[in-house]
């Protein structure tokens, strides 16, 4: 069974990272739509094999209203191998699509620079997928006030790639393993594994306080809401809550200090903010969590006043282990990403401070 542990390793990638740029831009009014000038011809490759025609066009025609896409298909203007096609037609390798001119809405800010190309540390790569070690503070995709994220930057860094799509997501503040599919078949197979809970995802989390050794399973329902600005908020609700979703986290105590505990948390369900809300609800929020944590303690930690001699300005949540079946051959793959340097430095400072206390 392939097993990548410890340092970052790469199968096929030797690219270098490009300097990061600002992640967000203020929104501006959208300009008028523009009309494509001529008929477009597209030949289907492995990246789109098996995809429905309507779904392919919705992705290919960025900025075209969904209703217009279906209207064009129904009119017969979209042709596959010179013949009319229905919206649910499955595409095959070698199919030639004839696409009529369509009116597209340009980007929200026409003067905004495109996402700067950027490579990320690669833990695993082959013809089907890429596993990267995402840094904290980087969104996985653009939206909600974020101009771009990992996927937009990766596409810019690899213009030769015909297909790059996120298999799953990580919170912006969370670092660690993130899968990107290089083929649609791989995307479908991997997302199916995630839906059926056949993957193993373990996170390293430093929490405030001393975690009780007897608490090893957290089984609490969660309810997600969106505020007027579109920001997500998650809270624990009763098991019989009409809109609550059962959420299970398995907890293993790794190391404890007087004021903090390092945990390994394996999620059996993949709810939004699951680990963060579960731990905070039990009185042990993730260190540095800006949404569910303690603001004053976060500020003290960032200023080096919580752990003497060590400033820590991020959330300590790291997706460190990921286990799944390879979409091409069913082989079990287990990947690990070591703790980022800043997290390791905080652990070392906690050890040093505890030793100093004992000596006194």
Language model feature labels by segment:
Residues 1-360:
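RNA pseudouridine synthases
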């Amino acid at each position: 069974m392939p097993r990548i542990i410890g340092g970052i390793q790469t199968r096929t990638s030797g690219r270098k990272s490009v300097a990061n740029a600002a992640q967000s831009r203020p929104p501006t009014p959208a300009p008028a739509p523009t009309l494509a000038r001529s008929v477009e011809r597209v030949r289907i490759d492995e990246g789109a094999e098996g995809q429905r025609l309507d779904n392919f066009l919705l992705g290919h025609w960025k900025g075209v209203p969904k209703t217009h896409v279906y209207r064009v298909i129904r009119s017969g203007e979209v042709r596959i191998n010179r013949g009319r096609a229905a919206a649910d037609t499955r595409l095959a390798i070698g199919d030639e699509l004839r696409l009529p001119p369509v009116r597209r809405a340009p980007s929200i800010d026409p003067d905004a620079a495109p996402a700067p190309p950027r490579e990320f540390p690669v833990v695993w790569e082959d013809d089907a997928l890429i596993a990267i070690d995402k840094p904290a503070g980087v969104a996985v995709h653009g939206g909600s006030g974020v101009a771009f994220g990992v996927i937009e930057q990766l596409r810019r860094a690899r213009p030769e790639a015909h297909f790059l799509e996120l298999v799953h997501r990580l919170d912006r503040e969370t670092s660690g393993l993130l899968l990107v599919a290089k083929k649609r078949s791989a995307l479908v197979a991997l997302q199916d594994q995630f839906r059926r809970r056949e993957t193993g995802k373990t996170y390293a989390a430093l929490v405030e306080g001393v975690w009780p050794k007897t608490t090893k399973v957290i089984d609490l329902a969660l309810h997600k809401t969106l505020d007027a600005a579109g920001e997500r908020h998650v809270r624990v609700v009763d098991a019989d809550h009409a809109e609550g979703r059962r959420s299970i986290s398995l907890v293993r105590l790794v190391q404890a200090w007087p004021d903090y505990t390092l945990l390994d948390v394996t999620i059996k369900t993949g709810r939004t903010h699951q680990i963060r809300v579960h731990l905070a609800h039990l009185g042990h929020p993730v260190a540095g969590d800006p949404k569910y944590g303690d603001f004053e303690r976060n500020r003290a930690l960032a200023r080096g006043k919580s752990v003497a001699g060590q400033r820590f300005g991020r959330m300590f949540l790291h997706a460190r282990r990921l286990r799944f079946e390879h979409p091409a051959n069913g082989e079990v793959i287990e990947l690990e990403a070591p703790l980022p340097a800043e997290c390791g430095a905080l652990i070392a400072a906690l050890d040093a401070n505890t030793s100093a206390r004992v000596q006194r």
